[in-house]
Amino acid sequence: MSHLRRRRFKLSLCALPVSIDRLLNFPAEKQMSVNDSIDPRFVFHVEDESLRFRVGDSGTKIRELETVGDRHFRTQQGFCGNRIEKDETMYSDGDDEEYDVSIRRRTALIQPGIDSGNNYDSAAAEETNRESKNPVGWELVVREDGEGNSTIDRHEMEFKVRITKPDGNVSNSHRNTQQKRDFASVEKERVTTTSVSSWESLKAILSDPVTGALMNDATILPCGHSFGAGGLKEVKKMKACFTCSQPTLEGSEKPNLSLRIVVHAFRQEEDSDHIHTLKRRKERSDQKRSFCIPNITETPKSSRGIQFPFSIGDHIIIEGNKRTPPRFVGRIAVIMTQCLNGWYVVKTVDNSESIKLQHCSLAKISDNSSTKVTVAEMPPSWL
């Protein structure tokens, strides 16, 4: 029995290449059969039509995955170097009247002269051809509402904006977004501009419409318009109001006391503000000067005290201290070298012996001759 089983297994193995050759050369339109001299043990039966594997089919394979939400991912792949990938993500806020923003990433690698073989309808093919002409990048689609309003936020990138109108027309435009400005600086600039404009408008109201000067001596006419001294002269010449051209009589004008009080208060406020501005400007300039320009008259900390009282070539007397050798005390020497931190190398006059001493151990020889004689007659300390 074992011998028969071995022989049957060998025959099956010999028939395997022939079966594989038939399988490869089998037409794609027909389903594989078990009765074509193929061992049933080497045949896999596919009952599901969607899971059928066909050899030699060069058509494109499309896999579509649809989720429950608003996202829809679609992948298209083809042979012969043609590849079209299109990932589309759509975001909706749930309101049909608001615009929908969809960001599409398009990637197209198409060889010229080769048909892509897509099996879509004419509208989808036209959209694919139109998108393949555009450069690879991000596309921001803004759909207008019924009233024709469309607004988009500014981002840090350059987008291609497609505005889809309700009638189906599509208009493309490039929009270079600006960088985000600091909110605090914008708010400060707006407050400053508002205050300046209100101040200027108030000054224009309190000024004479003829001369433009503040109406310190405001006078009101029967028509209700007020003028200063310069404007009142012009009104008397014309015998009519400069603003409304209403005729006026001589002596019909009266002083506008309330307007004079307001102008006086405005002038005081303007003067005080101007004085405060000058003071702040002066303080700021003084502060900059104190930080930038050092005071020349002030001695630095490193040079405080007398650290370098002598110069090279000066004649000095060695006074010495506790660490100075006794034989140098009281002798006349000459400054030879100036060192750091007030140290000097001195050389004695009588025997040219050098020693390094600090400035506090030295004293300058005065011009008094008696001092020189006393020093000259002083015997050496080492004798």
Curated annotation (Swiss-Prot):
Matches recorded under SUPFAM superfamilies: RING/U-box (SSF57850)
Gene3D superfamilies, A to Z: Zinc/RING finger domain, C3HC4 (zinc finger)
Protein keywords: Transferase, Ubl conjugation pathway
Pathway(s) served: Protein modification; protein ubiquitination
Annotated ranges, domain U-box: 201-273
The keyword Transferase is annotated on this UniProt entry: yes
Superkingdom classification of source: Eukaryota
PROSITE patterns: U_BOX (PS51698)
Record keyword Transferase present: yes
Record-level GO BP terms: protein ubiquitination
Reactions catalysed, as given in the entry: S-ubiquitinyl-[E2 ubiquitin-conjugating enzyme]-L-cysteine + [acceptor protein]-L-lysine = [E2 ubiquitin-conjugating enzyme]-L-cysteine + N(6)-ubiquitinyl-[acceptor protein]-L-lysine
InterPro entries: Ubox_domain, Znf_RING/FYVE/PHD
GO molecular function: ubiquitin-protein transferase activity
Region Disordered, residue ranges: 166-186
Protein's name in the database: U-box domain-containing protein 63
Lineage: Eukaryota, Viridiplantae, Streptophyta, Embryophyta, Tracheophyta
